[in-house]
């Protein structure tokens, strides 16, 4: 059976995001991936903060100052005969809910681990989010040009801490100053590393066969023997790669390399295009939508302001789930039941926008938004249904926000509500007083909000500390019991930006007591948009 042109386009799409702890090398890997996809000519190494050559995927002002990627940008590039969409996820010390939500829009994730450190805290958190949908995971052990931990130990740690089996695809030969290259377990080939070639695609020398005397000559007899001994162990102790188990999120293929030295990244990319799934079906509140359907559907997972400092526009990022987008198409925004003509959707190469004539499942479109689109919005060609699984996550950090000029209360509220619809921050208005409490998943979100309130709404605001530990969205099937709960806990209830009722707890103990005292009330950690 030959595939129709539409199905061919769908089959070649791969949409993935990178998850890692800050400084494990995510931005560097992103650059090298783009280099292989010929999307950029030379990789602008991230480190030189003073130089003008900023990494391609870092943009808003604050990012340029701090050398970190705050906004989740989207990059599309060709690789072999696939088209890859890479969604960048903010990775530095401070990230935000955007990072979590971006993971709901991809079909596969690449986990980058600093091989000197192993599994770190942020990696654990992000893996939990991918578990909500059993997303397939590839793993890249990075920084082999430094001294690393024992590779066997690293695999054990991933298996024990992240509860996913490891299937090594390549295996390192030495590390740090002695790093010589990697051996490919399934191709029986050794790829030799040369240092100092990080900015370009290297011509790699390949030695066929594990027992080839050329290998001893190339890496030295000691390392060659050590490799053979280690491989005996590896083959006995680790999982074989199995595509079914990979797609079910039960095992992860593991690649070793150095992103900075641009070595090993292509092995991982080859695995990605060969094994990662083409665009997957998704649930709505009424049925499952398959990527092969001809009617267009998509959902908004993120909204970003000011991608263009010259325009005060906001761009909504939409993941195409099924059907083909064509310029000038009429789509229904399900939440408002209005039909809109979309003639100026964008694709991205971080910061460089270009208008799209067409897009397919797995692609990400940017829609111009003047405050009418919200996170979680579904667009269809008329069918009334809503995609599920795009949550709000309960904030972990809270501040009270106060105006320097009390006459601007109205602008402040407007600004905060718009920023919360965009997912930049969450805002809570306590029922019993006039405070405004801002909740975030990461500290940097607070700085971003104050900066944006000033530049976009001309409001100067400051933060004060507030006695709030966590928030939970509350609901109850029994109206009478709910009224009683609301009456007795008025001082701890607040409305969020979308007017949903939330319980604001001063401590985890306080939350636990409330949950015990009111067993009929449900306290939710996430809320569907």
Swiss-Prot record:
Keyword Transmembrane helix assigned: no
SUPFAM superfamilies given in the database record: EF-G C-terminal domain-like (SSF54980), P-loop containing nucleoside triphosphate hydrolases (SSF52540), Translation proteins (SSF50447)
Entry keyword set: Cytoplasm, GTP-binding, Nucleotide-binding, Protein biosynthesis
Chief location bin: cytoplasm
GO (cellular component) term, any one: cytosol
GTP-binding is among the record's keywords: yes
InterPro entries, per database record: EF-G-like_DII, EFG_III/V, G_TR_CS, P-loop_NTPase, PrfC, RF3_C, RF3_dom_3_sf, RF3_GTP-bd
Chain positions recorded as GTP binding sites: 20-27, 88-92, 142-145
One Gene Ontology MF term: guanosine tetraphosphate binding
Segments forming domain tr-type G: 11-280
CDD domains: RF3, RF3_II, RF3_III
Functional note: Increases the formation of ribosomal termination complexes and stimulates activities of RF-1 and RF-2. It binds guanine nucleotides and has strong preference for UGA stop codons. It may interact directly with the ribosome. The stimulation of RF-1 and RF-2 is significantly reduced by GTP and GDP, but not by GMP.
UniProt name for this protein: Peptide chain release factor 3
Organism the protein comes from: Shigella flexneri
The organism's taxonomic lineage, starting at the top: Bacteria, Pseudomonadati, Pseudomonadota, Gammaproteobacteria, Enterobacterales
Gene: prfC
């Amino acid at each position: 059976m030959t595939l129709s042109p539409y199905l061919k386009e769908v089959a070649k799409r791969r949409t993935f995001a990178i998850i890692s702890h800050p400084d494990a090398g995510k931005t560097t890997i992103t650059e090298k991936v783009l280099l292989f996809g010929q999307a950029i000519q030379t990789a602008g190494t991230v480190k030189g903060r003073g130089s003008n050559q900023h990494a391609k995927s870092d943009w808003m002002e604050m990012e340029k100052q701090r050398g970190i990627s705050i906004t989740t940008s989207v990059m599309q590039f060709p690789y072999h005969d696939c088209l890859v969409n890479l969604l960048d996820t903010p990775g530095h010390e401070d990230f935000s809910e955007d990072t979590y939500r971006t993971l709901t829009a991809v079909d596969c994730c690449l986990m980058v681990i600093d091989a000197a450190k192993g599994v770190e805290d942020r990696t654990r958190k992000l893996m939990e989010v991918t578990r909500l949908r059993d997303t397939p995971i590839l793993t890249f052990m990075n920084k082999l040009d430094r001294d690393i931990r024992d590779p066997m130990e690293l695999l054990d740690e991933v298996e024990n801490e992240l509860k996913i089996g490891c299937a090594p695809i390549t295996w390192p030969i030495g590390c740090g100053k002695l790093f010589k290259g990697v051996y490919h377990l399934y191709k029986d080939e050794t790829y030799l590393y040369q240092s100092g070639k990080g900015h370009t695609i290297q011509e790699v020398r390949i030695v066929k066969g594990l027992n080839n005397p050329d290998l001893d000559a190339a890496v030295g007899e000691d390392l060659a023997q050590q490799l053979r001994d280690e491989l005996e162990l590896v083959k006995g102790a680790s999982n074989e790669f199995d595509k079914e188990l990979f797609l079910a999120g039960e095992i992860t293929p593991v690649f070793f390399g150095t992103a900075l030295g641009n070595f090993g990244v292509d092995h991982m990319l080859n695995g990605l295009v060969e094994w990662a799934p083409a665009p997957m079906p998704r649930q709505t509140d009424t049925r499952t939508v398959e990527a092969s359907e001809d009617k267009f559907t998509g959902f908004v997972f993120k909204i970003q302001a000011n991608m263009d400092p010259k325009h005060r526009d906001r761009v909504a990022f939409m993941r195409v789930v099924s059907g083909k987008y064509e310029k000038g198409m009429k789509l229904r925004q399900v939440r408002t039941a209005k039909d809109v003509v979309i003639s100026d959707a964008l694709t991205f190469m971080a910061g460089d926008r270009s208008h799209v004539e067409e897009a397919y499942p797995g692609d990400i479109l940017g829609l111009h938004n003047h405050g009418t689109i919200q996170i979680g919005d579904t667009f269809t060609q008329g069918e009334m249904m809503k995609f599920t699984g795009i949550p709000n996550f309960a904030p972990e950090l809270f501040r009270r926000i106060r105006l320097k000029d009390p006459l601007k209360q109205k602008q402040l509220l407007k600004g905060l509500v718009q920023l919360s619809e965009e997912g930049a921050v969450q805002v809570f208005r306590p029922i019993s007083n006039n405070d405004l409490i801002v909740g975030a998943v990461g500290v940097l979100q607070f700085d971003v909000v104050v900066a944006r309130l000033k530049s976009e709404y001309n409001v100067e605001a400051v933060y004060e500390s507030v006695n709030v530990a966590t928030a939970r969205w509350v609901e109850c099937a029994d109206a009478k019991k709910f009224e009683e709960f609301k009456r007795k806990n008025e001082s701890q209830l607040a409305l969020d930006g979308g007017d949903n009722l939330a319980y604001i707890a001063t401590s985890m103990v306080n939350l636990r007591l409330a949950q015990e005292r009111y067993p009929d009330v449900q306290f939710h950690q996430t809320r569907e948009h």
